[in-house]
Amino acid sequence: MSAPLANDTFLRALRRQPTDYTPLWLMRQAGRYLPEYNATRARAGSFLGLAKSPAYATEVTLQPLDRYALDAAILFSDILTVPDAMGLGLSFAQGEGPRFAKPVRTEADVAALSVPDMSSLQYVFDAVAEIRRALVQDGRQRVPLIGFSGSPWTLACYMVEGGGSDDFRTVKSMLYARPDLMHRILEINAQAVIDYLNAQIDAGAQAVQVFDTWGGALADGIYQQFSLAYMARVVEGIRAGADGQRVPVILFTKGGGLWLEAMAETGADALGVDWTVNLQLARQRTAGRVALQGNLDPTVLFAEPDAIRAQVRRVLEDYAAGGGSDGHIFNLGHGISQFTPPEAVSVLVDEVHSFSRALRTKARSHG
């Protein structure tokens, strides 16, 4: 029997249930802005050494929770574990982004592609189970654990480009010239992501997020066909957790503000939004069908404490103006910068919690 949750605020917000305050976690909360993360990474020898060791992955997942009163933990891993398991030869050169030795570019490459055997990703599922155990303190689990994956389209971008890209020329050329090949890659990726997230859930993930980092690079109409349709498949394929309820699913398309209505129709429980989106309008557009997660500009954290507090309040007030504070998970609009001063995050966390409590008290007194 798993330990009861000491703090289930995040899961309640995902299900649009009342909460005493607005919960928060941060994309890339276990990362290079923390000196303790850098020390662990140095011991691991490399990024992949860190990500592929359940013990190290557990250590770095817990580091931000020991420093800040965050309301969720997120598995420390990388979105490219899935294409790596497909045999594409992932590497990370020092100071450079990811590289695949065998990019998927020809008809033969696509024909050779298949959904990986999840046993090759056992190190991820072992990490999930180990993190769940490590989160238990005095017989109770401190906060819920989020699992995640890249979206089928975002994974395809790296697989076809062979790494990161400024303009996605290679992958978009394939999409327009050979949509049949692109759909084949996306079908395989969607099934792989479903299997991967369900295995994380079986190991103990209590919510999952699909990171569609590059969906916003697509034209309107193309996004719906080549990214959103496959994320909808993923949402449909997610199964129930230990309590019999389907584990909540968060979809996050960076630059996806244009498509919130369509994203809400996938059946996802929550949508992540970046800082270009007004949360009050986002609530109106999604008509209360989903929780919303976001959406502070990460660079606000380079400002003085008073400016950070003012921007936190603006985000919370924008959301509350749409009809109360419930159903909101505070986050950044994208991953936290490695150059962020750790003390700025303390200011952020304290302000989110204290001001969101104050907003609820004020709403009750006016109610």
From Swiss-Prot:
Q: Does the keyword Chloroplast apply?
A: no
**Gene Ontology cellular component?**
cytosol
Instruction: Report the SUPFAM superfamilies cross-referenced here.
Output: UROD/MetE-like
Q: Which domain of life is it from?
A: Bacteria
Query: What family is this?
Result: Belongs to the uroporphyrinogen decarboxylase family.
The top EC class, named as a word, is lyase
One GO molecular-function annotation for this sequence? uroporphyrinogen decarboxylase activity
Pathway where this protein functions: Porphyrin-containing compound metabolism; protoporphyrin-IX biosynthesis; coproporphyrinogen-III from 5-aminolevulinate: step 4/4
Q: Where in the cell is it found?
A: Cytoplasm
Quaternary structure annotation from Swiss-Prot or TrEMBL: Homodimer.
BP terms from Gene Ontology: protoporphyrinogen IX biosynthetic process from glutamate
- Annotated site (Transition state stabilizer): 78
Protein name per the record:
Uroporphyrinogen decarboxylase
Q: Which reaction does it catalyse?
A: uroporphyrinogen III + 4 H(+) = coproporphyrinogen III + 4 CO2
Q: Which UniProt keywords apply?
A: Cytoplasm, Decarboxylase, Lyase, Porphyrin biosynthesis
State which Enzyme Commission number(s) the record gives.
4.1.1.37
Q: What does this protein do?
A: Catalyzes the decarboxylation of four acetate groups of uroporphyrinogen-III to yield coproporphyrinogen-III.
Where substrate is bound, by residue?
A: 28-32, 78, 158, 213, 334
